[in-house]
């Protein structure tokens, strides 16, 4: 069952577009970054199409043989679920494992910049998008800011 609505996010500047979407299993999938696209260009049309298993990929779910985290362009990579890229974080989970699976939980749009104490901050932004990811097993959350 697909409990995640395959929503997409589009961030435009005067000259560039950045698109990503929520995959059917809840992962944030990078779709496009480059020259400014027309308003008619949608993430679902530009996203990678998968119909067969790629090489010796690890299946993420028995419900979809072609869905493999290692062959997807992801906004966030996890440990221990078949994505072999370097993860931006490593958590020791409450059960002692290092396995994580962060999926979309919610998002908010904030007016202006969201300052982060002790970190460099952007200035002059019209809006800031915050996406919250939640681990599928443990109540651990990550916020991504765009």
Sequence positions of predicted segments:
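N-terminal accessory beta-strand-rich subdomains and adjacent acidic, glycine-rich linkers
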Residues: 1-146
